């Protein structure tokens, strides 16, 4: 569930979540390429959902001839924020991309509070893969970047997916549209995200098709010295489903 503002897997050039997530066009290269980085964000907003406050989000990726493997994480400064660790394998050629992501959080909110009013969380084990006990969520993605518009479809196919009202697996899905443009010396992106059918995975509960993410983001490199600059980004997000609104800022290193 990658950066609050930028694409969750920009570091490995495959689309993915949190806030979030739009693929970039990747041409197959003839040599192995590796990347490492980290974002510092004022809030972790993923697909129109608030997943935490101030967070550090490291990333590590390697790619070769369109095939990529990446790791991404998020650690919030508040103790109640869950630590996230994601692994993604993907392939892209031209504007087409496909990937599989394994999302994992170290704890899950039970929905209850203790006698002092504090939220109660359960601790999750990483190597626990039971069908009804795992904290992993496995998601498949397919998309195409047309240049003026990028279209991506995501579906949870295994793990701790949401359910329908009848208790059956929802195969929770998400459709994301993204359009980049330049204005006033900044790189802008308009994002539109939709949940196509019933699930408890997004927004607590979604009874059917709904728009859950309308975002406008911008990025720019701030020059510190002649040889050093810091990429910055900011994004305004509204979620019509929950009537939530968020504004987040981040730095990339």
PLM region descriptions:
Residues 48-53, 80-86, 110-117, 160-168, ...:
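Outer-membrane beta-barrel translocator domains and adjoining extracellular loop/strand segments
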Residues 27-33, 179-189, 221-232:
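Short loop/turn motifs that connect adjacent beta-strands in outer-membrane beta-barrel proteins
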Residues 216-218, 222, 242-253:
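Outer-membrane beta-barrel "beta-signal"
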Residues 30-32, 52-56, 63, 81-85, ...:
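Residues that define the transmembrane beta-barrel architecture of outer-membrane proteins
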Residues 69-92, 97-130:
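Surface-exposed loop and membrane-interface regions of Gram-negative outer-membrane beta-barrel proteins
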Residues 1-33:
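Cleavable N-terminal export/targeting peptides
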Residues 37-44, 67-77, 98-105, 125, ...:
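Transmembrane beta-strand segments that form the barrel wall of outer-membrane beta-barrel proteins
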Residues 118-200:
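Detector for outer-membrane/organellar transmembrane beta-barrel domains
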